[in-house]
Amino acid sequence: MINVEIIKNYSKWREHKQINKALIKKITQKTLSQFDNFSEIKQFELSILLTNNEEILTLNKQFRNIEKATNVLSFPANELNWQDLRFSGNEIASSNKPIILENLGDSDYMHLGDIAFCHDVIYNESYEQQKTFENHFIHLLIHSILHLIGFDHQNDTETKIMENLEIEILAHFGISSPYLLIK
């Protein structure tokens, strides 16, 4: 089970009724199902902030020391490393080491972390990239969940692995690769 708490701090998010707890749970479940490590965990928790340029700018400055609005920020609750994950039946190579869950407390429960989305940046990007707002949001949600479980894009190898996972998960929802449009 995935518990999702959503805080909407910006009225324009109300225009996107399709972005709701049910959608976020479905996307989160599909993303986590890519890894055998999470199959034993019975309950996940995820907090979502749907906000505006002003608040995301404040968060980006406070936590990343970048004075610029961004589309999404991810705040992992745990220090995980993607190289410790076991992929479920896809082609991406990784280690077969079990992820260490003992230090997370109750192994039946895992707080994934917090994600903050900026409506205006996502809206502008989706317009510029000729995507629907919802599809762009779904892509950013998958991207953010991968960050919460230890993925990053600090080098070309990590970037390619992360992008391939995103493309694979998006395809499950009938969404084309977002990287074909922006590269």
From Swiss-Prot:
Protein keywords: Cytoplasm, Endonuclease, Hydrolase, Metal-binding, Nuclease, Ribosome biogenesis, rRNA processing, Zinc
Q: Residues that bind Zn(2+), according to the entry?
A: H143, H147, H153
Matching entries from InterPro entries are given as:
MetalPrtase_cat_dom_sf_prd (IPR023091), YbeY (IPR002036), YbeY_CS (IPR020549)
EC top class, in one word? hydrolase
Q: What is its EC number?
A: 3.1.-.-
Q: Say yes or no: keyword Cytoplasm present.
A: yes
Q: Which Pfam families match?
A: YbeY
Gene Ontology annotations of biological process type = rRNA processing
Q: What is its main location?
A: cytoplasm
Q: Where in the cell is it found?
A: Cytoplasm
**What's a single GO MF annotation on this record?**
RNA endonuclease activity
Q: How is the cofactor bound?
A: Binds 1 zinc ion.
Q: Which cofactor does it need?
A: Zn(2+)
- Name one cellular component (GO) term: cytoplasm
Q: Which protein family is it in?
A: Belongs to the endoribonuclease YbeY family.
* Stated role: Single strand-specific metallo-endoribonuclease involved in late-stage 70S ribosome quality control and in maturation of the 3' terminus of the 16S rRNA.
This protein is called: Endoribonuclease YbeY
Where does this protein come from, organism-wise? Rickettsia bellii (strain RML369-C)
